[in-house]
A protein has these predicted regions:
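Catalytic phosphate/metal-binding cores of nucleic-acid and nucleotide-processing enzymes, i.e., regions
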Residues: 2-165
Length: 165
């Protein structure tokens, strides 16, 4: 088990959080990242000191190591560029499988929590997925594809991350 110093984590989905159905920005013909949503994410990070860990399908070709960034696809590159534009960066991503077993989104989060020292975490996602089955709904701030991340979500996320501080 890899344990580092205790940290706060934002498990971040992208679609329906950092973009909406009406987002004009595009990435390879698909909906890209809405720059108007980035200040909301930045506020959460600034007020909690949390790190961003991807749970989104946007993580598929995202690379943590600088020397592997050339392997990234357009989605991962856009994510890095947009986050960097407001002083943010992705810290890590959840695993899709371990020991040959594929994970659900919830299981990927539980695996991450098992291998890292996390003091508090929040999940920003527009879908429920299997979070209730893994007893993670108390940490879920559920957005929607119409509005994405809003000030109300920001307030709730900060409360969850700073609980007990």
């Amino acid at each position: 088990m890899i344990k580092t110093n205790s940290m706060k984590i934002i498990f971040l989905d992208v679609d329906g959080v950092l973009n909406t159905k009406s987002t004009k920005a595009r990435c390879n013909g698909y909906i890209g990242i809405d720059e108007n949503k980035l200040p909301f994410l930045k506020e959460i990070v600034d007020k909690t000191g949390a790190e961003i860990v991807l749970v989104s399908t946007w993580k598929e070709h995202w690379e943590k190591l600088l020397e592997r960034k050339y392997l990234q696809d357009a989605f991962a590159n856009q994510l890095d560029e947009k986050l960097n534009s407001v002083g943010l960066k992705v810290f890590d991503k959840t695993e899709d499988k371990r020991d040959g077993v594929w994970y659900s989104r919830c299981e990927g989060i539980l695996d991450y929590l098992a291998y890292h020292k996390v003091s508090s975490f929040v999940i920003l996602d527009d879908f429920q997925f299997d979070y209730d089955g893994c007893d993670l709904t108390d940490n879920l701030v559920q957005t929607n594809e119409k509005d994405g991340l809003t000030p109300e979500h920001v307030k709730k996320a900060i409360e969850i991350l700073n609980l007990g501080n």
